[in-house]
């Protein structure tokens, strides 16, 4: 029996908990759920159009899949990256099944962009709302990468592993996303 099994669950690393969960410990898996459920739900909420119910269902799906495949967990693998990879794949499946991107692009083409004068100044809440709107208009691939890196605070290598693309591509897509955001929010400059 290794020493980390003697520590209280809250003091164990994610990897230690996942190793215990892979060996059959439901309490260790419950602790991982406690640590990640809120972040994953927030990720789904942003990615799936702000649908609270769909975000909650998708979060449960992530943990169900993780629980079902816990015995195949590769010891030493970053648990956060593993869970967000599952979440990312669920989002991709959701987009495919709903043809979400096609609808989004069609609606963007149909709605003319209205520009407000430069003197319009927004308070922090309004700027946050404007940013959320810009993010919702981004193609899913850019939105996923932005969300994983800036909102979920994952590193570039972690994002690259989750999305399955090279780190350089992640960096260039983040740069492209930031340029789009700056351009669309330029009207809100003082």
Question: For the regions a protein language model found, what residue spans apply to each?
Answer:
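Short helix-capping/turn signature of helix-turn-helix
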Residues: 35-38, 47-48, 147-154
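Short, charged helix-capping/linker segments at alpha-helix termini
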Residues: 3-6, 22-31, 42-61, 167, ...
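C-terminal edge and immediately downstream basic/flexible tail or linker adjoining helix-turn-helix-like DNA-binding
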Residues: 1-9, 20, 50, 103, ...
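Arg/Lys-rich amphipathic alpha helix in sigma70-family domain 2
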Residues: 68-75, 85-105, 176
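Internal acidic/polar
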Residues: 11, 93, 101-128
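Residues within the DNA-recognition helix of helix-turn-helix
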Residues: 36, 173-176, 180
